[in-house]
Amino acid sequence: MNRFRPRFRFAATAAALTVVGALLTGCAGSSEDRPLVAVSTNILGDVVTNLVGDDVEVMTLMRPGADPHSFEISAAEAARLRSADLIVSNGIGLEEGLQQHLDAAAQEGVPSFVAGDAVDVLPYTSTDAGGADDPHFWTDPAQTIAVVDALVPVLEGMDGVDATTVASRSASYRGELEALDAEMSDAFAAIPAAQRALVTNHHVFGYLADRFDFRVVGAVIPGGTTLAAPSASDLADLVSAIEEAGVRTIFAESSQPDRLVQALAREADVDVAVEELFTESLTEPSGGAPDYLTMMRVNTERIATGLAPR
C-alpha cells in the first residue's frame, strides 16, 4: 500500500505567502524558507540528508545512540512533526515509542513516506517473534537501495526542492551503497559456511543473514523488540545452541547493555568472545558509527574478524 499522500497547495496562495515572508524577514535561506522533512530514526535521517543536501531542513527525531524501539520525543518536536512537509519513517513496527505521534500527524494530513513499503519485508527468523515482520532492513544494503529508489521521486516532487540536485546526489549515494554491498559480499565470502553463525543480544540481522547466507542461531532478548526480557530457560536454550553450533563470537548492540551477553558467553562451554556492533542507531561523530556507510563497514569488519577461522 502506498502511504504517501501529497499535500496540494494553491499556487496563488503560495506565491502570496512567499512575498509576505520576504518582506517580513528581508532575507532568504533560513530554515523557515526550506521544506521540512521529519525523519523517525537516525539511520533513515542520514540517508535522507545524503539525498537532499541543503535544499531541505531534515529533522531527525531519534538521538544518536538511542533505542529505536523505545525513544520518545518532546512536545515541541511533536508539534513540528505535525507541521512537516513530509515524514519519513520505517513503518514496520520499529518506532514503538513514536507511533502515536506519527498517527497524529497522519490524521492532520501530513504527507508520509514509509520505507517499509519499498522493502521486500522478511519475517523474523525466530519462532519467539510469532511470525512478525522484521523492521531491520538496513542490514542489507540492497534493501536500502530499494528505499532510496522509491524515496527519490517523492523528494523531487516536493515544493521548494531542486529535482536536479536530488537526482545528482541520489545517483552518487546509490553508487556508494552499491560499493558497500560489494565490499560486504567480499568480506563475508572469506568466512567458511560452517562458521557463518550469528548470535546477538537482539534479533537484528535477519536481512543480513538472508542476503549473505548466514545462520541466525539465536538472540539473548526474545521476540522482535528490545522491550522484551529473556527467561532462565530462554538463556539455557541459547547456551545449548551456541555450544552445538560452535559459535566463536557473540555480537552485542552498542545501544543496549551487554551484561546478559557477557553472562551468556561465560556460561557457554566453549571459548566465546563478545564484540560490540552498531546495528540500530548511529553514534555521535566521535562514536565510531556517525553515518550509515561507516556503521555498515565497521560491522562488516567486526563480523568477518569475529567469525574468521582461528
Question: Can you say where each PLM-predicted feature lies in the sequence?
Answer:
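Hydrophobic core
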Residues: T18-L23
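Extracytoplasmic metal-acquisition and chelation regions
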Residues: N2-T13, L24-R310
